Amino acid sequence: MKKLHKILLGLSLPASLAPLSGFISTDADNSQFSLKKSSTEIKGTQSIHLLNLGESLTEEIKEAQKRTPETSFASFKQKFPNKESFVKGFQPIDVYNLLSGWKDAISSFLDKVVELQKKIEEANKIFNTNIGNQIDLPEDENPNVLNVLGSYGGEGFFPTLGKNGLNLPQQIFENFTDFKVVSHKIHDFQVSLVGERDIIKNDKVRFSYAVQIPLNLELLVNNQKVTFNITVDLRTNNFSTQETFNELFNKCIGPVNWQFFSRVKVDKLHYDQTDATHLANTLLQDQFNALNLDLEKSIYDLELPRLEAEFQQKYVDPLIEKKQRQKAEWEEAERIRKEEEEKHQKELEEQQRIQAEKAKNDEQLQKPQTELKKALGGIDSFVEFFTNNDLRLKLGYTKEDNVRTRAGLFRALEVSFGNYRAWTFYITLLGWKDTTEKIFKKAKWQDIRDDEKFRKAFGLSPKATEKDVGKVTNPGYGYQGIYIKDSLRDGIAKYSDSTVSEPKNVKVSLPGTVGDNEEGKIWIASHNFRQNHEWGAGEKFKYSAYRFKFDVTVDYDVEVSAKWWTWAFRGSIPGYWRGKFKVTYSFDGVVPSWKYGHIQVRTPQYSFNKQEQKILFVPHAIQKIAAEGSNLDLINPFLKDQKLDEFEHYHPDLTKPLDLVAYLLYAITTRS
C-alpha cells in the first residue's frame, strides 16, 4: 500500500491543487524539440547565405538581443504604427521585435487579472458570509478571472488555460472552485532565432523563432498558498529560405496568425511546506502542443480596456447589485425578526411579571408553578403535566390545547418559558437529544422518510431523497448528513467508487441540568441575546447567549476506491482505503463574535416564532472526523487537506436555525 502511495500523484497532491496538474509536463529529454541554444544557432554568414537574407542579419540579431524586450517591441510599433501597415510584410528582425512584446503583454494581462480579482473581493465584502472558504461560492461570486479574461480574448488569444494555451485538461477545469493569482513575475525572458542542420542535407539549416517565458506565480488555490513556477517554451515552424519564411510569416491566414509549438516545464511546485516539483515532472506526461495564435490581440493590440469592460459588465456590476440586495434583505429580515422577537419577549416578560405578582398574593398559583418546574425535568413528566394535571389551567393552558400537536406544544412552551426560561430551554434540548438518538438508530434513511410522525414534525415530503433526509436535521443522518463541500462530494462521486454504512455505535450526551453546580449548569441569558450588546448575566458567561454542551458520536464503515483513470487529477482522494470514520458533532453556546469583523454571521438565537409556531435556535457547532484502521497515512492527509478533521460552522447557510419544537414534538409523539 505504501508503494501505491508513492506511485499515485493523487495521494501526494491535495484536491485543492488538482487544477495545477494540467499545467505540468516532464523534463525528459526530447531531441526533436529543444529550445535551448544549440551549436547550430546562427554564428556566421554561411547559414544566412543559405537563407538569402543577407549577411547583416547575424549582427542585427546580436544587436537586438542586447536591447530590452520593451525597446525591441517599441521598434516594431514604430515601423508598424497600425495593423493596416502589416501589408508591407515582415522581415526576420520584425518577427523578432514583435515576439519581444510578449513579455509586457503577459505581465499587463496578469496585472489586470489581479486588479479584477480585487474588484470581486471588494464586491463580496459588501455582504460577506463566507468565513474561511466554508462553502463553494457560485461562479458569479468567485470567477476564475484568469480563465474568464482569456476566454474574452477570443480565438487565438494567449495566454489561456485551454487547448490553445497552457492546455489545461477539461476535466481539471471542472475542479476550479477557487483560483486566484496573488503575484507574478517574468524573469530571463528570451527570444532567439534557432538553427538546426537538416538530417538528410547536412549543408542545409532549418530555422525557427524560439520564445522562452519563465513565469513565477504565487497562487491561492482553494484558500491554500501555492508557489508555481513554470517555463513556457514556444517555437514557430521551421523555415530555410526567404520563400519559406514568407510562407510562414507573410502569407498566412491573418497578418499575424502564426502557428507555434509549446511545451510547459515545472520549475517549482510548492504548497503546504511540500515540494512536489520532481514528482510533478516525473509522473505527468510531456505536453507538446500545436497552437494557432493571433499575435495582434495577444501582443500588438492587447485590448485590456475591452476585456475589463466586459468583465465589469458581466461579473462586477451584477455582483455589486446582488450583494447590496442581499445586504438589504438580510438587514430587513434581521430587523423584522428582532422586532417580532422583542415584541414577543415583552409579552412573555409581562406574563411572567403578572404571574410573579400574583404568586405573591395567590398561594394557588405558587403550587402550579412548583409542579411545572418539576415537570420540566423530563419529557414524560412534561407531557403528563400538560395533558392530565389540572394545575396547568391555572397557568393559562386550556383543556382544548393538545401537547401532542404543534400548536398545543408551542402554547405549552410559551407558558413554561413565561415562568421558567432556563427550564424551558432544558426541555427543548432534551427533545433535540431524544429525537437525534432515535433517528440515528434507524437502519436506513428510508425508514426516516417513511416515518409519518417524523414527516409531520419536520415537514418532510413522502418523496424526499436521501440528501433531503440528511439535511433536515442537525446533526444529519448518514453520509448525506456529514458536512462536505458540494465540490468535494461531487469529486468523490466522479473520481471514485465509495460506500458508507448506516450509522453505528451511536452515543448522545447532554450532561448537566438547570440546577446543577456551576461547572455543569445548563443556562440561558435572562434576556434575548443581542450580539455586541447583550452578553448574558455576569463575566463568567461573557460571549455566551446560553450554556450547554450536546455531543453526538457515530461510527461509519467506509470504503473508497479511486477509478484508475483519475490518477493524475483526483487530488488527495485516496487510491484505496477501507476503515472506520468516527464522526463527532459538538454543540454549545460559545460565540466568539470578535472573530468576524464585518462578515455577516448568524447570531445566537432562541426565539419564539408565533406565526409559524417554532422555537428558532442557533447553536455553535463543530464537526470532527477521525479515521480508524490501517493505512491512516492515506486517509488522514485527505481529511486534513479538506478540513474534515475539524470543521467549525459559522456560515449562515450552515447555521440555519433549528426548530426545537419539531424535535420535541417528534420525541413526544413517538413515546409509548
Swiss-Prot record:
It comes from the Bacteria. InterPro entries: DUF237, DUF240. Belongs to the MG032/MG096/MG288 family. This is Uncharacterized protein MPN_042.
